Amino acid sequence: MPWSPGSSSAPSGDKDDIKSKLSSWTKPIRDHLSEGGNWIAPIIAAGATMGFWSFYKTYLRRIPNSAHVSPRYFHRRSLFGKVTSVGDGDGFHLYHTPGGRLAGWGWLRTVPKLKKELKGQTIPIRIAGVDAPEGGHFGRTAQPFAAEAQKFLDSHILNRRVRAYVWRRDQYDRIVATVYVRRPPFFQRKDVSMELLKQGFATTYEAKTGAEFGGPSKEIEYKVAEEVARQKGKGMWSLEKGGGFFHPSKKARAIESPMAYKRRVKLAEEPQRKLDS
């Protein structure tokens, strides 16, 4: 009767034959691995694979929305992408395009244009260090120059590629970031927060908690830019100066900062919130 090779009852001759065959099959492998130099290629290949995967996760993997922005990014990383919409004077949505043109964005890979394709695929960005006039949301009266601030930001960054240095996540799940854009004709890198302040379309952020400027030096630079715009009567600050000699009917008026406006509105709406609850 035939004997199973693994049977304990198999003839000793068959066992020896099996061992001999196994040894002959594995000997070339053992001989190959016994030479130290033969380990180099597999080790390099494994290291290269791990290195590429790490590089991909860190620099080339697209982040679809703010929920996927890890806290380890804060104060360490930046996000490069295209601005798909501007919501108000200090906020917009970013479609992350890691690697930029070198990674094929714009010629091999395209940014969606339809709203349904962009849904859940963009990161809401809150521009750091500044506060633009509040728009008329939820039936509230808009602040003066809210529309002008949004129009300026729209013309400055919409459909352009920007780099956002991320600092933290705010209470509305937006990513607070210092944003830079390059614009023609010389394509110098411009700090968007600074540009808003220079035009008088924002104040420096006033909240005692949660303020993010990207460093003490930035906060000082922003406050200086705000004061210069105020002295020149730029944007919202023109209301403080009135109409001057040529428009005497336009009286000078005090400016309510965006933060003061939000505090006033919150206080006025508090009784209604208590009734609703």
From Swiss-Prot:
Active site: 126, 134, 174
Record-level Gene Ontology MF annotations: endonuclease activity; metal ion binding
Membrane topology type: Single-pass membrane protein
Protein EC: 3.1.-.-
GO cellular component: membrane; mitochondrion
TNase-like domain residues: 77-239
A Pfam family the protein falls into: SNase
Chain residues that bind Ca(2+): 131
Keyword Transmembrane helix carried by entry: yes
Family: Belongs to the LCL3 family.
Name of the protein in its database record: Probable endonuclease LCL3
Species the sequence originates in: Podospora anserina (strain S / ATCC MYA-4624 / DSM 980 / FGSC 10383)
Gene (name only): LCL3
